[in-house]
Amino acid sequence: MAGAAGLMPVLPAMAGQARLRVAMACPGRRTDPFWQMASSVMQAAARDLDIDLTIAWGERDRSRIIALGKSLVDDQPDYMLVSNDYRTAVPIIQAAQRRDIPSLIAFSDLLEDDISMLNNGDEIRYLIGSLVPDNARAGRIMGRSLVEAIRQAGTSPNGRVSLIAIGGARSTQAALQRLEGLHDVLRADSTVDMLDEVSVNWSRDEAYQRTLALLRRQPQVTGVWCANDDLALGAMQAASDLGRRPGEDIFFVGLNWQPEALDAVADGRMRLSLGGHFLVGAWALAMLRDHHDSRQVQAAGVREVVKLAVMDKERVGFYRQHFSGDAWERLDYRRFRKGDASHGFAVETLLAQLPPARLPDDRG
């Protein structure tokens, strides 16, 4: 990285490299903080990797995402990047298969039913593989950290911890997998009570309204597990409006490294935010560059998982010192290519200048 993080020096330009055309129907809204971060980083990576990248915005509407994906296929790019949020991947991949366009799954993986629908004999034609976040691990870390914070604060005098969970849209794998991680924590600790679990379509306003109702009904709640930062910010506002004190008598965790959430982590209102998975798209583009330059004809079937990193109060200041502003966009993403990247697909390795993450235990 230039200057700001001191991680990745600029590499010499790759001479004679053919430009690629890559397209993606993004499942998110243009206003989603996570997808804003992810798309900005993808555009930066595309510049470094000689890729012409087209991103169309699905606005969290399944029909729109599929229609956009098929339209992008009609433009005949060299590759399609496909996310399976809202179960949209199969029709887009099938459209790409009909035109012999390879696809790579990114951000949200196929389900078993999807694989059965796409399977043609022993393999899925023109599917290179997948690169997805380890959402279940993230959900576990969030759950354990939340319980630990409550116990350390002494807000569970009878030894029991009362939680509620604000999950994301159940039609997205990220929401389901993060909840799966939380449920692992609940099964392992019989002293934790999950009093309520609701799902919202990744909406801060909806998280605010649902949390307001839940805390009015169950004021004994001392922890709110939230599937992402936007939901945590909405839930925190609801708690504050009811006279609760986030970080003192009620605790919150989130995910995405949203700047506003990192403010809350820094001042103690949020226990932590996991993140770094906005880099998935950049890593995916590097994989496509490698796939093209190796002249592979058929799919490799590779499945890679990206481990998210913890941002807590001890680390957030250092993070902002080294990675603030457009620092992520100024990485040299040619370093993400196979053979150049020594860090694999772990965000933590990119954060080497930060203090070590303090996890609740070593099972994360």
Briefly describe each language-model feature range.
Residues 1-15:
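N-terminal export signals
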Residues 21-41, 45, 54-63, 71, ...:
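Extracytoplasmic "Venus flytrap"
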Residues 33-48, 138-145, 173-192, 210, ...:
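Short, solvent-exposed amphipathic alpha-helices that sit
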Residues 47-58, 165, 187-204:
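Short beta-strand elements in bilobed, periplasmic/extracellular small-molecule ligand-binding domains
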Residues 65, 128-160, 207, 257, ...:
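Hydrophobic alpha-helical segments within soluble ligand-binding/sensing domains
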Residues 80, 84-99, 182, 196-261:
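Hydrophobic alpha-helical
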Residues 94-137, 261-262:
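Flexible loop/hinge segments that line or gate small-molecule binding clefts
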Residues 166, 170, 283-364:
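Hinge/cleft segment of the Venus flytrap/periplasmic-binding protein
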